[in-house]
Amino acid sequence: RDDLVRIIQQLGKKANLVGASLGGMISLSLAGHEEESKYCSGLIMVDIGMRPNDEGSDRIVEFMRSGAKGFASVEEAADAVSGYLPHRERPKDISGLKKNLRLKEDGRYYWHWDPLFLTDRTGMGEVREERFRQLENSAKRISVPTLLVQGALSDILTNKEKEEFLNAVPHSKFAEIQQATHMVVGDKNDIFAEAIVDFLSEHIE
């Protein structure tokens, strides 16, 4: 959140925050902060509520861990993605996947995220629960125009998490993106973009 505040301060004006997954939770923590909410003029939560669904979250972590030892080729990485997202047609040209991979000295391709993100989470339960409680409190303080976007096939923002968020932020608008999973932008980018533009056009400052 501190990094986000610094970026907005450099812009010199309030920001409409659009956050997916972890980015959504960071945006929520700012928009509902007692002091720093002054930097936010609007909030769009993309397939995330005050907490992720536990089963869906575990599935993502398992996918990330499955690539911890890297891939022999871009094709092998593409196979892993196809296994995780079986509903999405595998593109004929997979060269775009290279931007998400790093070729290291051992000749293998690795996802570019920080491996520390995947360290053993044993004993972190209380810490995570406290963070989620803070997000619940933040949600109750939200006063700016808000939109919650849900991928209809999502296992991260299920109907349970959706209803919890809408109850905490009763003025929030809601948009469901059909045939989209948690990866809303990658699944149905055109429909997602239309929902975002419509909301911002109505509420932008």
Regions found by a protein language model. Give the residues of each.
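Alpha/beta-hydrolase active-site loop
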Residues: R1-Q10
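C-terminal alpha-helix
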Residues: I7, A195-H203
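Conserved hydrolase catalytic core segment
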Residues: Q10-E55
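Core-facing hydrophobic residues within beta-strands of well-ordered domains
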Residues: S37-S41, V169-S172, A180
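A catalytic-pocket lid/entrance helix-loop region that shapes and gates access to the active site
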Residues: C40, G49-V74
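Conserved alpha/beta-hydrolase catalytic His-Asp/Glu region
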Residues: A72-G125, E129
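Conserved serine/cysteine hydrolase catalytic core
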Residues: E105-A168, K173-E176
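Catalytic histidine-centered segment of alpha/beta-hydrolase-like enzymes
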Residues: I177-A193
